[in-house]
């Protein structure tokens, strides 16, 4: 069986996207890469920012409980902190904290600030049941006063030149406290607010309620970034129109199509064949920090999402669907012995 590079490059299908598009986002506006626990780690951030079109990344969350974390915890989750808080492509990375204790979050933010992050983001949006049961993420949206206390404490704890932003959903079980939470975040001194246009109960089920972001944007005096269910250029157009925002945050959509930010900007986008070296680069990167038993799963997770956009990703996924052995994945997809045992 021919490896990925050979077999797929022989079957490159015409791209359904025009190579040059009318920009959906003014050139002076920005596109952010979302934090996604278990998916968008530093390896995938590296790949996606190499493709281009991203202005700012936000890391997956760093869980803060009742302890002052050592700096190595921050740099393990956000190794870009050792590179001027930027990816290899030079894109700034903000580090995200998640917790419910204002004092402990402030203490950890102060320590994180010693590593000079491009910014500190606060997570009020994670819908994961495990996180919510431990009073973290979107469940905090039931307590706007606590949300305010957290943002205010972190803002006081870090130097003024380090931005403190927040990411929230429309609410926990419903959106009744949506504006109260937005006001809590704004009045506490946040520099920016990202809004995922669904509640915690909505999870990731479509649709996203972009029009609700417009209500938030009209109610607060700080920049608001729209997030949620943007998979295509048309989605981006609709999101911008309905939310009234001029800045987008992309999550699963750009994992499925790493060139989505370029397409939204109306720039030339790479073919599947041009993405193949980046897929191999990702595989080599995860070999350095993901255990062998989970390594194939990480690659299949990405290929599974890419199947939405690229027929060739379906071929690649099928090649490795039944194996979790890194050496076999290496041989099937890249046609060379594994670089790591």
What is the predicted function of each stretch?
Residues 11-12, 17-21, 36-111:
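Glycine-rich, positively charged N-terminal anion/phosphate-binding segment
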Residues 60, 123, 196, 244, ...:
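Conserved residues at the C-terminal ends of beta-strands
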Residues 72, 135-141, 265-268:
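Short glycine-enriched, charge-decorated loop/helix-capping segments at active-site entrances
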Residues 36-38, 62-64, 98-100, 125-127, ...:
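Active-site beta-loop-alpha junctions enriched in small/polar residues
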Residues 57-58, 96, 121, 194, ...:
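Conserved beta-strand positions in the central sheet of alpha/beta enzyme cores
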Residues 3-32, 37, 43, 156-159, ...:
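Alpha/beta catalytic cores of nucleotide-metabolism and tRNA/nucleoside-modifying enzymes
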Residues 109-120, 124-130, 134, 146-222:
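Alpha/beta enzyme core
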Residues 54-55, 118, 191, 246:
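Short acidic/polar active-site loop segments enriched in Thr and Asp
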